[in-house]
Amino acid sequence: MPVPPSAAPRAITYVGHSTVAITLDGVTLVTDPLLRRRIGHLVRYAPPVVPVTADAVLISHAHQDHLDPPSLAKLGRDTPLIVPVGVAGLLRRRRFRDIREVVPGDRVTIGSVEIEATAADHPGNRPPTRINVESLGYIVRGSRTVYFAGDTGLFPGMARIGDEPIDVALIPIDGWGPKVETGHLDPVGAAEAVRLLRPRIAIPIHWGTYAPFKRPARDPIATVETFASLAGAAARVLAPGERLEV
């Protein structure tokens, strides 16, 4: 017999970088899949990628470490891809067949969960192509509400997202470059995002996974510990590959 959605597993698996498997009410959504050991000069120094499957994929923006066609292919070319407007052509040329372009406010239903695209503050270009799209976050609603911030800095609408009760917020806390630039959150900014959003659980992402030639610009453990101390009781730190029942 089918498992009722309310009785199905509800879990967050931090795969690493911006890749998270959100399992909710019988549906698994994977965010920004990066499932390779290496992409360009970025090399995975965390443990190998845990196996993941997806009923749909959420893409936040067009940067190569967030929109990676070889990683998407591992999840199947018929898997629905929910993406910013402007990247469908790139994906169709790579033979992906179910592409759903969205802008902030658009909603998509996958199984028993609803996904709403939200704004984000992050560059949307994809060098060396001419692609330049609006970066997104996503709210996933079912028996739990999960907010995936994508890659973002603080932005005016973030507090309004927190007007809705959020069970789990997935918040980026670092970048891989020598400094955390505009359009990103460092641990202090990420803790401020938690204050604005007021989630029950805040899970840091975009840390501890990839670095240029396996040489992180900052100590990842110190980075995540700083976030956890500033974010307070809501913070739940998952190492790459770790799963939390929610």
Question: Which stretches of residues belong to each language-model region?
Answer:
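Cap/insert and terminal regions of metallo-dependent hydrolase folds
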Residues: G86-G89, P156-E242
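Short, polar loop motifs at secondary-structure junctions
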Residues: G16-H17, P84-L90, V103-G105
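Pre-active-site segment of Zn-dependent metallo-hydrolases
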Residues: P2-P4, A21-A62, P69-K74, V83-G86, ...
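Beta-strand-turn-beta hairpins that frame and shape the catalytic cleft
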Residues: P5-I12, T23-L29, R107-E116, R141-V146, ...
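Zn-dependent metallo-beta-lactamase
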Residues: M1-V30, L35-R37, D219-A222, T226, ...
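A short helix->loop->beta-strand "cap" motif at the edges of active sites that frequently abuts
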Residues: V27, R77-P80, F96-R97, R198-I201, ...
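Active-site neighborhood of phospho(di)ester-bond hydrolases with catalytic His/Asp-centered motifs
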Residues: T31-D32, T53-D65, I82-V85, Y147-T152, ...
